Each structure stands twice: as C-alpha cells, then as structure tokens.
Amino acid sequence: VKLYGDISDEQSGRIFETAKSEFTRLDSLLNRYSSKSEIYRINESPPGSIRVSRELIDILKRSFRWRDITDGLLEPKIGHLVELWGIGSGTRKIPSHTEVDSVMKSIRESRLNIIDDTSIAITGDISLDLGAFAKGYAVDMVYN
C-alpha cells in the first residue's frame, strides 16, 4: 500500500494499519482456500440451506450484479474451473476441451439462491471463487 498526499507519518501509519486490518478481515471472509472463511464453508457444504453473514449476502448480490453486467465473465461459481486449471495450487495445467466443457456444464446447472439476509440455498456442486470481484470489493471497502 502506498500513500500519497500531505499527511504525517503518524497519519499514514494509522491509515496503513486500518487498510491492513480491513484486508485481513475480508480475506477471512472471502478466501476460498482458508478453512476459516465463509466461502470455504459454502464450498465444502452439501446442497441445501446455509446460514451466512449479512455482509456475505451483500457481497454475493454485488457479485451477481457484476456477473450479469459482464455477461458471465465475472462468474462467482467458477471455483471448479479454477481448480481444473490448477490456479492457486502451484501445479497449473492446461485441461482438455472435454474437461472444460464438463465443468462449464456443472457451473451452469448449479444454483445459489439468496433466501434472506442471512441464508442461501445451493443446488448442485457449487464452488465459489470471488477472486477478481473480491479484490475490487476489498479496495473499495478500504477506500471508504
């Protein structure tokens, strides 16, 4: 994090610590690889209803909006495709067209519905990865 402007070292230190704290908090909510995050818990859950935080509901709604705006390019249910390519695992690979088609079919068939302010329902084999969206959201939250 780089800070620019006419601010004291004390102010910049406070701003940096606040930003770091917010990034850490959001990582604990949205990191699909951390067993302590809500996203990880959803990805490991069987189909059915799941209780989640109000903040995650808001984030999911925003991610769905961006999925629609981008005609599916920012798909929050892309986790299995990320796994297929080995992204984040240290062993990346190029999957076959057949493998990609199979995973894409699973993504299209799975559903995540928001029930209320603290519940979602999943059907099918869902694997969320908010990746790019989460990074942008985190920067927005720190900026605010």
Regions found by a protein language model. Give the residues of each.
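Cysteine-centered nucleophilic/redox motifs
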Residues: 132-144
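A contiguous, well-ordered beta/alpha segment that forms the leading edge of an enzyme domain
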Residues: 1-130
